[in-house]
């Protein structure tokens, strides 16, 4: 690794319905990484999956980074320890690049689910975030909930279905013990494709919507009214795992729940409270449970754990291993409330990536 600035490549965009959220998250991370400490390269992933050099079309003033439609394509070399080629399609020889750390700012399938993490493992380069197993386990809400249930952690009752194995409204309602249901894609975040249903007609429409985004969908009991409480978890370079201050999301009555529109298109879609006003004993239980969830799903580096709280009842809702870093995102806000501003948070994430990669390289690969 260079003795000067640490070479960091920010990977953003991606083949996911959360492509635009990734672009906004990446813009904030780009601004938060100290240019005096890090040499930054921007790599956008197009909707069709091409990795494209994006430095020329972006700067630190962008609200959301741009993924260029064309430009030099980036090829990360297997076992290259961060070496890459920029290929511009001309007869000229490819330009050689090198990175110490990859920062994947990717949300949803083909980015947060272990696929990109697998490519980075094969490239033998340090990277921010969970590894393949933790990323994949947390991404699939069905698998995650089963692992959490087996670990003795409280979850909301649910069933799953696919287009090939449909479930009727009556059977789903009977299975989870409620006529009011949430239907959601199993492998997507940012509330994309989620619906609240109260009868068979709404349920059928909700299933069709969710199946547009995923081959497997989750059907959960609606336990409203609840408070939506979140906790950020961070693993430091030495392996210590810490939980942040808590945050609360209060969706506007006009939305009914924290939908995609409430998050990203309606400025008044929800009120965000950091720190959340929670009884100290309940807050302590939530923070402890967040670190237990982190361990049960084999998470590393960072995660945001979302809870439903009703009185003294606490349920794990879901886990995001690459949480949003937009200007409204809770993960950086909760750490800031805990005394860790975003630039320092970036330093912690990069330091963990480098330390983990060094530890992994010490493991024997031959007998």
Curated annotation (Swiss-Prot):
GO-annotated molecular function: ATP binding; D-alanine-D-alanine ligase activity; metal ion binding
What does the record give as cofactor?
Mg(2+); Mn(2+)
User: Where Mg(2+) 1 is bound, by residue?
Assistant: 306, 318
Question: Where mainly located?
Answer: cytoplasm
- ATP-grasp domain span: 145-351
Q: What cystine linkages occur within this chain?
A: none
Q: What is its EC number?
A: 6.3.2.4
Q: Which UniProt keywords apply?
A: ATP-binding, Cell shape, Cell wall biogenesis/degradation, Cytoplasm, Ligase, Magnesium, Manganese, Metal-binding, Nucleotide-binding, Peptidoglycan synthesis
- GO cellular component, as recorded: cytosol
Report the Pfam families cross-referenced here.
Answer: Dala_Dala_lig_C, Dala_Dala_lig_N
Identify the pathway: Cell wall biogenesis; peptidoglycan biosynthesis
> Which domain of life, per UniProt?
Bacteria
What reaction gets catalysed by this protein? 2 D-alanine + ATP = D-alanyl-D-alanine + ADP + phosphate + H(+)
Q: Which InterPro entries match?
A: ATP-grasp (IPR011761), ATP_grasp_subdomain_1 (IPR013815), D-Ala_lig_Van_CS (IPR000291), D_ala_D_ala (IPR005905), Dala_Dala_lig_C (IPR011095), Dala_Dala_lig_N (IPR011127), PreATP-grasp_dom_sf (IPR016185)
The entry's free-text remark on the cofactor is: Binds 2 magnesium or manganese ions per subunit.
Enzyme superclass (EC): ligase
Any idea which positions bind Mg(2+) 2?
A: 318, 320
Write out the annotated subcellular location.
Cytoplasm
The role this protein plays is:
Cell wall formation.
Q: Which family does it belong to?
A: Belongs to the D-alanine--D-alanine ligase family.
Name-wise, this protein is D-alanine--D-alanine ligase
Give the source species: Bradyrhizobium sp. (strain ORS 278)
């Amino acid at each position: 690794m260079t003795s000067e600035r640490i070479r960091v490549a920010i990977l953003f965009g991606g083949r996911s319905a959360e492509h635009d959220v990734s672009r906004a998250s990446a813009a904030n991370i780009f601004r938060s990484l100290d240019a005096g400490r890090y040499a930054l390269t921007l790599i956008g992933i197009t909707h069709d999956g091409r990795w494209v050099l994006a430095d020329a079309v972006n700067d630190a003033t962008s609200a959301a980074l741009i993924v260029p439609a064309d430009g030099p394509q980036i090829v990360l070399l297997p076992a290259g320890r961060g070496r890459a080629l920029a290929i511009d399609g001309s007869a000229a020889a490819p330009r050689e690049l090198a990175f110490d750390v990859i920062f994947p700012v990717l949300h949803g399938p083909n980015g947060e689910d272990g696929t990109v993490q697998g490519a980075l493992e094969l490239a033998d380069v340090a990277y921010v975030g969970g590894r393949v197993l933790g990323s994949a386990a947390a991404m699939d809400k069905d698998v995650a909930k089963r692992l959490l249930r087996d670990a003795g952690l409280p979850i909301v009752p649910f069933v799953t279905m696919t287009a090939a194995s449909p479930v009727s409204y009556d059977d789903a309602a009977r299975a989870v013990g409620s006529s009011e249901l949430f239907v959601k894609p199993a492998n997507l975040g940012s509330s994309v494709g989620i619906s609240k249903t109260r009868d068979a007609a709404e349920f059928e429409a909700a299933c069709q919507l969710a199946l547009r985004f995923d081959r497997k969908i989750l059907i959960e009991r609606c336990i409203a009214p609840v408070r939506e409480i979140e906790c950020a978890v961070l693993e430091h370079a030495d392996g210590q795992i810490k939980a942040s201050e808590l945050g609360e999301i209060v969706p506007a009555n006009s939305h009914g729940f924290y939908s995609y529109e409430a998050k990203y298109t309606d400025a008044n879609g929800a009120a965000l409270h950091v720190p959340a006003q929670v009884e100290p004993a309940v807050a302590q239980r939530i923070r402890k449970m967040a670190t237990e969830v982190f361990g049960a799903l084999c998470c590393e580096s960072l995660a945001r754990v979302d809870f439903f709280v009703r009185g003294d009842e606490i349920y794990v809702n879901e886990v995001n291993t690459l949480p949003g870093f937009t200007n409204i995102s809770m993960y950086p806000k909760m750490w800031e409330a805990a005394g860790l501003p975003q630039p320092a948070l970036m330093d912690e994430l990069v330091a963990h990536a480098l330390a983990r990669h060094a530890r992994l390289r010490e493991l024997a690969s031959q007998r």
